[in-house]
Amino acid sequence: RRLIRAPCGSVAAMQHGKDVLSAKPGMTTFAQLDEIKRVQKQTGRIYGVLYSEHFEVPAAVEAGNLIAAGAIGKVVNTIGMGPHSLRLNNRPDWFFTRNRYGGILCDIASHQFEQFLFFSGAMDGEVVSASVANRNNPHRPGLQDVGDAHVRTAETTGYVRVDWYTPEGLPTWGDGRLTILGTEGYIELRKYVDIDGKPGDNHLFLVDKKGVHYRDCSQVELPFGRQFLDDVRNRTETAMPQERCFNAMKMALTAQQMAEQGTEWAQ
């Protein structure tokens, strides 16, 4: 088994009868998305993207469990924040080339688009507005170091923001957060750090009519790997619906395209 990192590798693998789990973002253009969708439908193979800020974060998994149990009522809004550390000395040249990494919303915000759909209980959504910029790295003109987007479904709205501005003083690569608003309460995830608060990671705060509740989610089971292997064996879609997998990336690509209208990025 191998985690595939290139769209052409995903297509070739499916054409040779293999199921695929790709690193994010899976693809960087609509043409690649269309080709992967065509081959997936033609071959009947499973194509997945490892949206790790959901599938590999116990707090995000537990939030899904709580929402499924009705803990905050009906979800109406999400706010997903994905700050990252640039660490210039550890990045290859392609990282700063727009047509190779796909743009900041396509790349790291793909996590947030998937989570918006998942917590909304939706298979698809609409991008209302989006923006990208290079505010702090003029010597790297191909880099987009901040981006955001407003999104919605028929029942929910959301906001996504990603950046490469994590200060060196933070003891981890990013203060990733997610707030999920429901009709009967809300959940806040502090995924990787609770700044100047509780030690460790995977912090979940739940506010409902009974009060304020805290959960340390560090020991919550991560079911994605087990579910994905079950899907491979049984030809099911328990780990992630195929439609949602593709539509999260469609939203990311749509937001990227919308944000770049009228601009010209160094290639």
Q: At which residue positions do the language-model features occur?
A:
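Contiguous beta-strand/loop segments that form the cofactor/metal-binding neighborhood of enzyme cores
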Residues: E114-D194, F224-R235
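C-terminal helix-rich "cap/oligomerization" subdomain common to oxidoreductases
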Residues: D34, L229-Q267
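Active-site loop of classical SDR/Rossmann-like NAD(P)-dependent oxidoreductases
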Residues: R215-R226
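Oxidoreductase and adenylate-handling cofactor-binding alpha/beta cores
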Residues: E56-G80, C106-R135, G147-T157, M258
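A contiguous active-site-proximal alpha/beta segment in oxidoreductase catalytic domains
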Residues: I4, G26-L88
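Mid-domain beta-loop-alpha active-site segment that forms a flexible
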Residues: L50-P58, R87-G125, G142-D145, R244-C245
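A short helix->loop->beta-strand "cap" motif at the edges of active sites that frequently abuts
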Residues: H16-K18, T43-I46, T156-T157
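Rossmann-fold NAD(P) dinucleotide-binding segment
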Residues: R5-A23
